[in-house]
Every structure is written in C-alpha cells, then in structure tokens.
Amino acid sequence: MIVIDIPAQTLAFEGRSYLVSTSKKGPGEKNGSLCTPRGRHIVRAKIGAGQPLNAVFVRRRPTGEVWTPELHEEHAGRDWILTRILWLSGCEPGRNRLGEVDTMRRYIYIHGSPDTAEMGKPGSIGCIRMRNRDIVELFDRVPPYAPVQINA
C-alpha cells in the first residue's frame, strides 16, 4: 500500500519513503477546490511507461517535449506534469468517489515535477508531486489498482 502523509509531506511504499509536495491549499475533496483528497484510493491507471525523464504530459498524453529550465521560462505558470503519472481513483463513495468529490474526475495524480519544484512543502494544485527519479522508481514497483491511503 502507498501511504501519503500530508502533514509530513511524505509518500511511503514497501519500506521506502519519499519527500513529496501536496496541495498548497491543504487537504480537501470538493471538485474545484485544488486540494489534495484524503482517504482510501487506488491507482486506477499508470501512464508514461518508457517515456524519458522530464517528458512533459498534457491531458495525460506526452507532448514530445522534455522539460528544461528554458522551456519552463517559455511557459511560465504552466502546471508541469512530468515523466510518469499514477492516476488515482477514490474508494469511498461520498468522500472521494462520485458526485462533487470524485478524485478521478478531479484528475488527481501522483506525478513527476521539475527539478526546481520544492519537495517536503505544499505547492501543488491538488496532485502529489514527486522528484522524477522517485516517480520512475515508484511507477516501476507499483502494480495497477494498488491501494493508496492519503492521511491528513
């Protein structure tokens, strides 16, 4: 099971612990809140196998771009989703599944981030950001439909 600890800004899986960055708006489930959802989830989809480190994704598809500081400057303000995506789906109807609280419909992912993104401090708009090498390691070890617990 993947365990994400929002206050500690960590993700743990099979004896490994990684620094992450969750929402700068804190925990929450409502659609449009830009918060990181809590509770039981699963990895509904794994996206990006075989893509290079820093591959850029838009709407879960690789753009063919590879993130660089120069590309970052050209697209200031872009929410960078890089390298790999683990798309989460809630398992608790009314809390993080269905209706106005559906994690999957909110497009909440565990994903790679630019090297300039600070880990260990909230900074995302809902997703769980990781270092690119860390998300590749996690992606390769996590099976589809793996359980995920997000605690606040």
Map each language-model feature to its residues:
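N-terminal post-signal-peptidase region of extra-cytosolic proteins
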Residues: 1, 21-33, 65-72
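A short, compositionally biased
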Residues: 3-12, 144
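Short, surface-exposed secondary-structure junctions/capping segments
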Residues: 28-47
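Extracytoplasmic
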Residues: 6-8, 15, 38, 81-83, ...
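Exported/periplasmic cell-wall-interacting domains
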Residues: 53-152
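Solvent-exposed coil/turn segments that connect beta secondary-structure elements
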Residues: 7-9, 23-25, 46-48, 89-91, ...
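Short, surface-exposed loop motifs enriched in S/T, G, D/E and P with embedded aromatic residues
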Residues: 15-23, 41-45
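Short, solvent-exposed loop/turn elements at domain surfaces
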Residues: 12, 28-29, 51-54
